[in-house]
Regions:
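Bacterial Sec-dependent N-terminal signal peptides
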Residues: 1-26
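Low-complexity, acidic/polar, glycine-enriched regions of mature
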Residues: 20-185
Length: 185
């Protein structure tokens, strides 16, 4: 009986401590889901990527993403082939998209307190060999020792020298695509 009580108290103690754990320092993503969506009158195109890796420094707000471009998954294999081809993203020459930036107002995010925090991230996005400064809204959801970052924003393909002058892709792919990010640290 004494052993059961001690085991119960130890379990309650461990659970209580874990409930008050906060995120500090640099953390690496545990899982990620990125999507892009293109809408035109001709068709909708979407793809998923579960292979992105990210780090977040809770003390400085620094954020880094690395996205392997060949890991985007499409419903149709032909779309995947076109996506990776030299005529579109040329993923052999440009295998990764990268983002390196910072949470602008880190005082809005309390990594030591459960909650959902709205803020902005700003930094350099490199895609298809082109680097542009972007500034986007993000949601930071803190729950115990886990942080979830979500964002949805638009990327204009021409900003990264991705363009179709003629042919079927010119009418099938939107000039601006919607990107969604859902990352757990």
């Amino acid at each position: 009986m004494k052993r059961v009580i001690l085991t119960g108290l130890a379990t309650v103690g461990i659970l209580a401590l874990s409930a008050f754990t906060s995120v500090t320092g640099k953390v690496t993503s545990k899982k990620s889901h990125l999507t892009f969506f293109s809408h035109t009158d001709v068709e909708d195109i979407s793809a998923d990527n579960y292979k992105a890796v990210s780090t977040l420094d809770a003390s400085t707000g620094a954020v880094v993403f690395s996205v392997p471009m060949q890991s985007f998954e499409f419903d149709k294999s032909l779309m995947q082939k076109h996506f990776n081809s030299p005529k579109f993203l040329d993923t052999k020459q440009f295998p990764k998209a990268k983002f390196k930036g910072n949470i602008i107002d880190l005082t809005k995010v309390h990594f030591d307190k459960d909650g959902t925090y709205q803020t902005t991230v700003e930094g350099d996005m490199t895609l298809h060999g082109e680097t542009k400064n972007i500034k986007e809204k993000i949601s930071v959801i803190v729950k115990g020792d886990e942080v979830n970052v979500k964002s949805k924003f638009n990327l204009t393909l021409a900003d990264y020298k991705i363009a179709f002058e003629n042919g079927k892709p010119a009418t099938n792919i939107a000039k601006t695509v919607e990107v969604s990010i859902d990352v757990f640290y």
